[in-house]
Amino acid sequence: PEKARYAGKAEIAQPKLNLCRERLENGFYEAIPQLLRNYLIDKLTADAAARHIDAANDATNVFNNLLTERLTKPDGSQRRLATIPTGELIDGFGRLLAYVAPWYAGESDPLPPRDDPRRYTFNLNLIANGWAAFFPIYPSLPSNRDFNLAIAAAETAWTEKRGAWASYGDDLLLAYEYRACIKLAAAADAEEGIKKAFQRVCVDLRSLKIVGLYGFYDIPPCYRLWIWEQDLAEATEILNLVQE
């Protein structure tokens, strides 16, 4: 989830979400399919901003505890942090796309076997315990083996209602949903808002069916794959995607 720095503290962000809800209800965004509008409206509760920001802060605390736990060796000394770049190394916003994991130095601190949970990245840990949304974006995807591991972890976290879903409920806005709603509220007109809020095509990982810019509402979060519109033709061919 996003912290307060994205759209302000809850008392600042909530009026923006309220405006988004009003626009979704009053026809301002009639070009957005009704079922997607309903999906977002159900999540735009009176405390949506506070719950989202609180979940983000809780996730940070969980991550910090994981760092302490997994980077501390049995003798009390500290492991270094390994950074593993993947796919599109630098995204369109200048961010490094990478996985992070404990660095096992060698004989004195040997690398665990491949299937050992001690080999998991922190990214996978947070997905598995329900404190990070599963948000794979083509082409920045791991190997098939690691991708399937992440899907399974996300599925378990969702079906068992772990982490953020246990603490804040199924109607918690995920980070990309939160950002979309803020953009819908800020836009001067409907066309601008829709263009800024919905830039990635969603694919249902269960069937590899392309559900488009607006069909993600019908896909559980653990089965959503995202593709930038400009990458869709390439991804369709490489991943054998199915047109809806």
Features from the language model and the residues they span:
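Small beta-barrel nucleic-acid-binding modules, primarily SNase/OB-fold domains
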Residues: 1-244
